[in-house]
Amino acid sequence: MLQQVMTNPGEIIFREVPVPEVKDDQVLVKIMNIGICGSDIHVYHGKHPFTKYPVTQGHEVSGEIAKVGKDVTEFHEGQKVTIEPQVYCGQCYPCRHGKYNLCEELKVMGFQTTGTASEYFAVDASKVTPIPEDMSYEEGAMIEPLAVAVHGVKQVGDVKGLNIAVLGAGPIGNLVAQAAKGMGAAKVMITDVSDLRLDKAKECGIDACVNTMEKDFGEAMVEAFGPDKADVIYDCAGNNITMGQAIKYARKGSIIVLVAVFAGMATVDLAVANDHELDIKSTMMYRHDDYVDGIELVNEGKVHLRPLISKTFAFKDYLKAYQYIDDNRETTMKVIINVQEK
């Protein structure tokens, strides 16, 4: 079978390797689609701090079960699935308490261990989640980033009836806004400096879409929610400007959730956060229930994935996909690799 390998930053080869053997508790997945995310782009540019080369990528994935191990009873051949890419020890304190996304030895497929970018991939059945038969494989590859969003939204508990502001309308910000709305938020506002991204958010049903190059964030919150402003602000941009906006304009005693990963050291006014008794939370990846809840939101028509798909590339055009993203960064949301198209 064919397998993608990034040998060095910006260099991709394809090699023939044997189809993997399936252990008793595993399934063999015929890989259909793979999404490229911001972390993959960091690997492509040699800027991911926890990835060594060579590496086979692919952690946002959909596929079809081609074979099941003899001890696997919950899956069958031909079933549509997605894969949770976390590899965890199961022994550390977080793992023992159900928080394996915080494992002390956490590895992620496509970064610290072999990813799914091959025609077939053998994986523990426990890491496989079924997707509906009427869900496209492109959408199935986007369940992983949706799970990130769902997990982030859940960090504040139940969002029903809350007013939510989301900073950053890229793929994750868009999905956080959609997930919050789908999970019962009263009203959701999203901000960005890109009209294209804001138009995508509007297409996905977000209530208020604000370009902060044209309108002050604090003013926009009052306009959207009234003088009480937002109950929760999700920072999905991850820079000093957006975090500074969140701290400056958050209602006293409200919540800020850090969803985006900061590229460098954050320099924000924590004195204001302290004085205003702001509850600053963070979020890390997801767990199985976030996959299940995300799939349900899509199935119920509360989250729309297809508008986020910008372009699809054939498997052997993996490098062209990265080049396309670099050349069209301002107009690209999500690029998908079709593994079965060579």
Role assignments for model-derived ranges:
Residues 66, 188-189, 257:
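Conserved beta-strand positions in the Rossmann-like core of class I SAM-dependent methyltransferases
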Residues 135-214:
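Mid-domain Rossmann-like dinucleotide-binding core that forms the NAD(H)/NADP(H) cofactor-binding site
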Residues 3-21, 38-67, 82-83, 100-114:
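N-terminal glycine-rich cofactor-binding segment
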